[in-house]
């Protein structure tokens, strides 16, 4: 959930359509894995980001580029067709948002909730397991946890689940204390 990409209305519609197709043909998990892999590739490759975002490339060139990447990565045929369709319709600017929306739909379908845990230092496997267990008990759903390190927290955790933020960081406690002392 460290992802800040929001789906546009068009991206949401593409995600919903792809989601329904994957449910029909039973390829939900494979297509989701393909899309997550593509999103990671985009994050790692400036050239791929430029291909998706730049108006200098025609829709045809974008389609050829995305389908070539998909074939080389061994993506499902449905994923490859989806990428070609998005490019052909001139909607590559909506692609990352559509992927985020698709992943959300898939998680909701599986009864999984995504959570982002931000800590001052990297969590050990035992600490991560403890956070997952606590979230599962609090939310009543299986959490899919992503972690991020932010040294400015000084200690403690911040956990974001959907639009809710649980802030148990030392930084926020010190800020609260500072504010209380200024008011006194």
Swiss-Prot record:
Main location: membrane
Alphabetical list of InterPro entries matching this protein: ATP_synth_OSCP/delta_N_sf, ATPase_OSCP/dsu
GO molecular function per UniProt: proton-transporting ATP synthase activity, rotational mechanism
Keyword rRNA processing on entry: no
PANTHER family recorded: ATP SYNTHASE DELTA CHAIN
Domain of life: Bacteria
Protein's membrane topology: Peripheral membrane protein
Regions annotated as coiled coil: none
Family to which this protein belongs: Belongs to the ATPase delta chain family.
Record localization: Cell inner membrane
Residues annotated as signal peptide: none
Subunit-level organization: F-type ATPases have 2 components, F(1) - the catalytic core - and F(0) - the membrane proton channel. F(1) has five subunits: alpha(3), beta(3), gamma(1), delta(1), epsilon(1). F(0) has three main subunits: a(1), b(2) and c(10-14). The alpha and beta chains form an alternating ring which encloses part of the gamma chain. F(1) is attached to F(0) by a central stalk formed by the gamma and epsilon chains, while a peripheral stalk is formed by the delta and b chains.
Cellular-component GO terms for this entry: plasma membrane; proton-transporting ATP synthase complex
HAMAP family: ATP_synth_delta_bact
Protein name according to UniProt: ATP synthase subunit delta
Described function: F(1)F(0) ATP synthase produces ATP from ADP in the presence of a proton or sodium gradient. F-type ATPases consist of two structural domains, F(1) containing the extramembraneous catalytic core and F(0) containing the membrane proton channel, linked together by a central stalk and a peripheral stalk. During catalysis, ATP synthesis in the catalytic domain of F(1) is coupled via a rotary mechanism of the central stalk subunits to proton translocation. This protein is part of the stalk that links CF(0) to CF(1). It either transmits conformational changes from CF(0) to CF(1) or is implicated in proton conduction.
The species this protein was found in: Caulobacter vibrioides (strain NA1000 / CB15N) (Caulobacter crescentus)
Alphabetical UniProt keywords: ATP synthesis, Cell inner membrane, Cell membrane, CF(1), Hydrogen ion transport, Ion transport, Membrane, Transport
